[in-house]
Amino acid sequence: MPAINRFASLGYAIPGAVIAVGVLVPLGRLDNLLAGWLEQALGTKTGLLLTGTVAALVYAYLVRLLAVALQTVDAGLAKITPSMDDAARSLGTSPIQTLARVHAPLLAPSLAAAALLVFVDVLKELPATFALRPFNFDTLAIEAYNLAKDERLAEAAAPSLVIVAVGLLAVLFVTKRYFQATRS
């Protein structure tokens, strides 16, 4: 598992623009292969099918933010010990019941924190979103950037403030969870 964590953390260490290019190149080649095959098989020109779609954007987010989610969930998995599984098995529970009654309640806070942290990172991600977004698909970060670029700073304040407020709420939630866990 440490090797997977180290490999996944590369996405967070590499700039978003580099990840965007790293996603665009293979998707462009795949688009060209699909377009050639569809033109040969069906006789229609399709153009780009994957590049500039939400699927490409989600893939870039997955590469970029896997480390955030993986480390948070890994911390939750550390709470589950083999003795818990042994105890559940000795009480006659099936593996599915053990998952539902033991693992899921212990992992729920970590999964919620991971989802929240990834949501906040997606909300503020600009370089990969800017390069890979479909036309007329503006996130808060892109809207704030476009308004600030046009020197409409008063208008750029609203989307920027929403990004900061959501980030602050996430930090407060995770901090509260951390202090509750250390007290118990």
What is each model feature region?
Residues 20-32, 36, 75, 109, ...:
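Juxtamembrane/transmembrane-helix interface segments of polytopic membrane transporters
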Residues 10, 14, 63, 70-73, ...:
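Transmembrane alpha-helices
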Residues 2, 15, 51-55, 85, ...:
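Residues that define the loop-to-transmembrane-helix transition and helix capping
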Residues 123, 129-172:
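Interhelical loop and adjacent transmembrane-helix boundary motif
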Residues 7-14, 27, 58-66, 116-123, ...:
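Hydrophobic transmembrane alpha-helices
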Residues 3-4, 20-62, 96, 132-135:
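Membrane-interfacial helix termini and adjacent extracytoplasmic/periplasmic loops
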Residues 47-89, 114-115:
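Membrane-cytosol interface at the C-terminal ends of specific transmembrane alpha-helices
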Residues 74-89, 93, 97-101, 116-117, ...:
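C-terminal transmembrane helix and the adjacent membrane-cytosol boundary/short C-terminal tail
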